[in-house]
Amino acid sequence: MRQHVNPLSSFFQLPLELPPPEQLFRVPDQPIHLDIGCARGRCLLGLAERDPHWNHLGVEIRRPLVTSADRDALASEHGNVRILFCNANISLEGWMKALKQDQLQRVSIQFPDPWFKRRHRKRRVLQPALLLAIATALQPGRELFLQSDVLNVIEPMVALTELSACFDRPVEDQRHWRASNPLSVPTERERYVLKQNLPVYRVLYRRNQNPLPSVSDLEQRWQEIDNPAEALTT
């Protein structure tokens, strides 16, 4: 069973300066796929083998998983995958901002820790500031992929993403949930869930050309939907 960590604890609030692509990848100018909450990184390691012309970066808040995952990444054949420890909501914005234009071309959040209770809203991985940082880094047409096996986990992510108005579903993919994974390698969790014949809820978005809302405005509108009683008192 996956052990949760509280991202709001003081230890995880310390910002970390993540290395630039030049220090991470053998060919640093290749397009980057960023996987937020990559666990042991098995999906990314498989993608790196299949897609050597992409660089793949996973970030994970559980340090014991990162130690072994990045050891495997460093041993990969193509030098195009790394797994780093950080709190995505604290350390990723500056790293994405420093990238070359259109270097980040895909972001995925797959099976995040299920902080689905409303009082734990601020522990969820996809927060307004992080979503807008992703939207800033992605050029129009670039992808954001979300999936979970817990409906109460993915629905708030979908609500937040669509409230931002920065992303659209592909024209050919207007169904509520995608039937298939657009990535060619499933995560460990996805394999387990599908083996149990349980549902997986997936949504693929592409960055549109809309301007970004302010973080405070997006936070307020998200709170009004996700926790109306709290919104009335703030």
From Swiss-Prot:
<comment type="function">
    <text>Catalyzes the formation of N(7)-methylguanine at position 46 (m7G46) in tRNA.</text>
</comment>
<dbReference type="GO" id="GO:0008176">
    <property type="term" value="F:tRNA (guanine(46)-N7)-methyltransferase activity"/>
</dbReference>
<dbReference type="GO" id="GO:0043527">
    <property type="term" value="C:tRNA methyltransferase complex"/>
</dbReference>
<dbReference type="InterPro" id="IPR055361">
    <property type="entry name" value="tRNA_methyltr_TrmB_bact"/>
</dbReference>
<keyword id="KW-0489">Methyltransferase</keyword>
<feature type="binding site">
    <location>
        <position position="113"/>
    </location>
    <ligand>
        <name>S-adenosyl-L-methionine</name>
    </ligand>
</feature>
<keyword id="KW-0949">S-adenosyl-L-methionine</keyword>
<feature type="active site">
    <location>
        <position position="113"/>
    </location>
</feature>
<comment type="pathway">
    <text>tRNA modification; N(7)-methylguanine-tRNA biosynthesis.</text>
</comment>
<keyword id="KW-0819">tRNA processing</keyword>
<dbReference type="InterPro" id="IPR029063">
    <property type="entry name" value="SAM-dependent_MTases_sf"/>
</dbReference>
<feature type="binding site">
    <location>
        <position position="117"/>
    </location>
    <ligand>
        <name>substrate</name>
    </ligand>
</feature>
<protein>
    <recommendedName>
        <fullName>tRNA (guanine-N(7)-)-methyltransferase</fullName>
        <ecNumber>2.1.1.33</ecNumber>
    </recommendedName>
</protein>
<feature type="binding site">
    <location>
        <position position="60"/>
    </location>
    <ligand>
        <name>S-adenosyl-L-methionine</name>
    </ligand>
</feature>
<feature type="binding site">
    <location>
        <position position="87"/>
    </location>
    <ligand>
        <name>S-adenosyl-L-methionine</name>
    </ligand>
</feature>
<keyword id="KW-0808">Transferase</keyword>
<dbReference type="InterPro" id="IPR003358">
    <property type="entry name" value="tRNA_(Gua-N-7)_MeTrfase_Trmb"/>
</dbReference>
<feature type="binding site">
    <location>
        <position position="35"/>
    </location>
    <ligand>
        <name>S-adenosyl-L-methionine</name>
    </ligand>
</feature>
<comment type="similarity">
    <text>Belongs to the class I-like SAM-binding methyltransferase superfamily. TrmB family.</text>
</comment>
<dbReference type="Pfam" id="PF02390">
    <property type="entry name" value="Methyltransf_4"/>
</dbReference>
<feature type="binding site">
    <location>
        <position position="149"/>
    </location>
    <ligand>
        <name>substrate</name>
    </ligand>
</feature>
